[in-house]
C-alpha cells in the first residue's frame, strides 16, 4: 500500500511541474505577454516602394527621370544647354516633346527629376501647382540667373494632356473631349502652339459653360467630341463638316467659331445669321484672350507705322488695317490690354471700313471657295465682320434669345417683325450714326 501511495504522489508532483511550465500566468488586463529575447521573426512583409507614388504617373518625363534615377545614372550638367534661351522650351517637358526631339528632352527629364526628388521628395515631383517654381529653382541650381516663365495655369493645364501619335498625325493632343490633330508643327516648334492649345481649349470650355448656364444651348450638342484637324494648307480658310462635326483649321482664331458650327449652327438659308451667331459666341464674348491679343497687335503695329510703306504703295490690306485703327481709336477704343479691348467697337469699325472701301470678301465668295459650289443664301453679300456687326446690333435691340429663335425657325420676319432688308437698313443707320 505504501508503494502505491508513493507512486501516486510522484505522479501528482510531475503534473504540477508540467503545468507550471506550460501555463501562462494571469496578466493584468490589456497587458501583452512578454516575448522571448531569443524568438525568431518569420515575417515576409515586403519593404515599401519609395517610388510607388511616381510609378502611377502617366507623364512621360517622370517615366524617363525615374528610370535613370533607379539605375543610378549620372545626370548631365545642362548649364550650357540652358544658357541658350532658345532651349528653355525643352524645360516644359510636355509629352509631345519626346516625339518632337527625344534626344534633347530625355536628359532634361532626367536632370529635373533628380533635382526635384533629391531636394523636395516624391510628392513634389507630382506637384503641378509648384512645378514652375521648382523649374526656376533648378535653373538657379545650375548657376543661371533666369526664371522659368511659363504661367502656372498654363503649366498645369498642358501637363494634363493625353498624347498619342500615328502614321498620319504625328501629334495627337487631347484634353477631355477636345482633340487636336497635327501632321506636324509646320515650320515651328511645339512651344509656339502652347498658348493656342491653352486658350483655345479653355475658351471652348468657358463658352460651353456660358451656353449651358444661360439656357442658350437648345438644339446644340454641347457634350459632343470636338475634333480639330490642324491643316495649315495656306488657304486661310476653315471648314466644319456638318455630317460629322470634324473641323479643319487654318486660322487659329477660328476654333470656337467652328465649334459653334459643330454643335449645330449649320443652317445656311440665312448665311449672315449663322455666321454672325458663330462669331458672336466664338469671338465677340471674349472667351479666347488670344483673339483680342492678335487684333490688338495689328492695331498697335498700325499705330507705330509698320504698315505705312505698304499702305502708301496701295496695298489694300494694309490700308484697311490703318483705317480700322483710326476708326477704332477715334471712337474711344483702347489697345492697352485684352481686358479693355472692345470687340464690339472693333467689329463695327472693321465693317464700316470695308463698306467704305468696297474691298472685302463676301460670305458667298468664301462659301464658294470652301465648298466648290455657288451660294445664293440670304445675306451672302455681307462679309464676316459685317454679318457679325449686324447680329450684334440685333442682340442689343432684341436679345440673343430672339436671335437664336430666328435661326432655329429661319423665319426672320415673324421673330423680329421685319424682314432681312429692313433689318439691314436699320443696322446701317446705326453703324453710321
Question: Where would I find each of the regions flagged by the language model?
Answer:
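Positively charged n-region of N-terminal signal peptides that target proteins for export
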Residues: 1-7
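C-terminal motif of bacterial Sec signal peptides marking the signal peptidase cleavage site
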Residues: 18-20
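Beta/coil-rich, acidic/histidine-enriched accessory regions frequently appended to metallopeptidases
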Residues: 22-27, 33, 37, 41-46, ...
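Zinc-dependent metallopeptidase catalytic helix centered on the HExxH motif
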Residues: 43-80, 240-347
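Juxtacatalytic substrate-recognition/specificity segment
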Residues: 43-59, 174-270
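Sec-exported extracytoplasmic/periplasmic mature domains
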Residues: 52-55, 71-76, 114-122, 130-134, ...
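Solvent-exposed, acidic/flexible segments
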Residues: 56-64, 102-110, 118, 122, ...
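Active-site-proximal alpha-helical
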Residues: 66, 70-71, 84-137, 307-421
